Swiss-Prot record:
A motif (Integrin interaction) lies at residues 382-384. This is Nephronectin. Residues 317-349 have a biased composition (Pro residues). Residues 420-563 form the MAM domain. Residues 301-373 are annotated as: Disordered.
Length: 565
């Protein structure tokens, strides 16, 4: 009996544990897609989300641009598109077998077939021999409309030239055919156009669509303000403002010098107009306001010149205390007078008066006058504030004045004129990675700071290559160019790095190459000849090669290189 009770107890515990274990492992229900059983509960599987109508739909992050989401992070692209998120155009003309027997032109999301000269495009897409088209000698084939031969162009962005046989590009940006969203500018291409973000904006995927987002140059450090200025981000750009105590345009800020003169004490000036002269004895040329108080600079005391009036000799003290001098108002018109602080006198003694030499009514006759004319002193500046000079007549011992450097001086310092420069820290700077290559140039973080480009690892067994192209375009120069760059080809069987230039059609033989070595090296190459259309860096790697190919600090200058290395 005890054995049976123990067996029943063990069986119940086992069934309970089995039920709990089954609840921890979700199992998908075969009859429903996206539904899983979590023990006794049924819910959407991982990577699926329940919609408002109750069904479970797969979730793809980021979203499929030209396709539909059929599973967790799995897109099914529409015809003509490829990529993980269906955001890349599929080049159908490069597929094998080719979709067209004669000429094939890839378009965005599709392709078009064209016939060779002497053939006509039929409604089913095939090419049929047509003697009339061979005689027309059209660039992209022809079509017969109502018995008339007409050459055709493969894209709406192309139109027939005046000769009626060739096709020329239509500038959609200039003609107004293009319509770009806000914050994007139109850039014409051959046969089409693209909408590119304005300078100061980056194309980002926000809110389920691509938008041009403002770049905060201040937080990223991509500004050229003075070290004595602050950077303020604005929409699409930034501005620089000098800090307090500095002045300038923000790109260049100069310190504002502060000049202070120690006052000696207040002297009350009585009401009325007066003139205090500046001459060889150090007086200030200053006209006070009515009833104002003036703080003169420290100057030695000069005793006044006494007139011949019968006055007593004043009693002076070594350090006189400035006191207000009461003066009765004289009869008009008043002469220009010079008043100086006098030592205190006894009440019964009259105050000595100093009268100027200016001839005016009311001047007492027989008085000894003082010349109040402004003396010519070319070695001293005039004004309310004076900057004291040193004995050598030099101001630069007091203030630090920054000497400006003109553009001509900089051109003399650097005789090679820069055409292009890129360190790949903030992008490719106009360099283009060819998408048709098996390998690609990828940016990688440099332990010393910044970024450099490296060739991705090969996955296929055959020989693979990655090309990096700089189209010169408007930078094209009629003379020689100096190409300078840093590079490394390290490791066992690392591969090969080569430099090419393209002038007309395909590029020629390699101008330079490296297939081994240790560490970074600096190389300069003179690109000789005119009409260089593009510069190409080619990196080749094979599967299983463990080495690394690196490229950084590429620049182009006009003229010959100072030394080839």
């Amino acid at each position: 009996m005890d054995f049976l009770l123990a067996l029943v107890l063990v069986s119940s515990l086992y069934l309970q544990a089995a039920a709990e274990f089954d609840g921890r492992w979700p199992r998908q229900i075969v009859s429903s897609i996206g539904l899983c059983r979590y023990g006794g509960r049924i819910d959407c599987c991982w990577g699926w989300a329940r919609q408002s109508w109750g069904q479970c739909q797969p979730v793809c992050q980021p979203r499929c641009k030209h396709g539909e989401c059929i599973g967790p992070n799995k897109c099914k692209c529409h015809p003509g598109y490829a990529g993980k998120t269906c955001n890349q155009d599929l080049n159908e003309c490069g597929l094998k077998p080719r979709p067209c027997k004669h000429r094939c032109m890839n378009t965005y999301g599709s392709y078009k077939c064209y016939c060779l000269n002497g053939y006509m495009l039929m409604p089913d897409g095939s090419c049929s021999s047509a003697l009339t088209c061979s005689m027309a000698n059209c660039q992209y084939g022809c079509d017969v409309v109502k018995g008339q031969i007409r050459c055709q162009c493969p894209s709406p962005g192309l139109q027939l030239a005046p000769d009626g046989r060739t096709c020329v590009d239509v500038d959609e940006c200039a003609t107004g055919r293009a319509s770009c969203p806000r914050f994007r500018q139109c850039v014409n291409t051959f046969g089409s156009y693209i909408c590119k973000c304005h300078k100061g904006f980056n194309l980002m995927y926000i809110g389920g669509k691509y938008q041009c987002h403002d770049i905060d140059e201040c937080s990223l450090g991509q500004y050229q303000c003075s070290s004595f200025a602050r950077c303020y981000n604005i929409h699409g750009s930034y501005k620089c403002k000098c800090k307090e105590g500095y002045q300038g345009d923000g790109l260049t800020c100069v310190y504002i010098p502060k000049v202070m003169i120690e006052p000696s004490g207040p002297i009350h000036v009585p009401k009325g107009n007066g003139t205090i002269l500046k001459g060889d004895r150090g007086h200030n040329n200053w006209i006070p306001d009515v009833g104002s108080t003036w703080w003169p600079p420290k100057t030695p005391y000069i005793p006044p010149i006494i007139t011949n009036r019968p006055t007593s000799k004043p009693t002076t003290r070594p350090t006189p205390k400035p006191t207000p001098i009461p003066t009765p108002p004289p009869p008009p018109p008043l002469p220009t007078e010079l008043r100086t602080p006098l030592p205190p006198t006894t009440p019964e003694r009259p105050t000595p008066r100093l009268t100027s030499i200016a001839p005016a009514a009311g001047t007492p006759p027989g008085g000894i006058t003082v010349d109040n004319r402004v003396q010519t002193d070319p070695q001293k500046l005039r004004g309310d504030v004076f900057i004291p000079r040193q004995p050598s007549n030099d101001l630069f011992e007091i203030f630090e004045i920054e000497r400006g450097v003109s553009a001509d001086d900089e051109a003399k310092d650097d005789p090679g004129i820069l055409v292009h420069s890129c360190n790949f820290d903030h992008g490719l700077c106009g360099w283009i990675r060819e998408k048709d290559n098996d390998l690609h140039w990828e940016p990688i973080r440099d332990p010393a700071g910044g970024q450099y480009l490296t060739v991705s690892a090969a996955k296929a067994p055959g020989g693979k290559a990655a090309r990096l192209v700089l189209p010169l375009g408007r930078l094209m120069h009629s003379g020689d160019l100096c190409l300078s760059f840093r590079h490394k080809v390290t490791g066992l069987h690392s591969g090969t790095l080569q430099v090419f230039v393209r002038k007309h059609g395909a590029h020629g033989a390699a101008l330079w190459g490296r297939n081994g070595g240790h560490g970074w090296r600096q190389t300069q190459i003179t690109l000789r000849g005119a009409d260089i259309k593009s510069v190409i860096f080619k990196g080749e790697k094979r599967r299983g090669h463990t080495g690394e190919i690196g490229l950084d600090d590429v620049s182009l200058k006009k003229g010959h290189c100072s030394e080839e290395r």
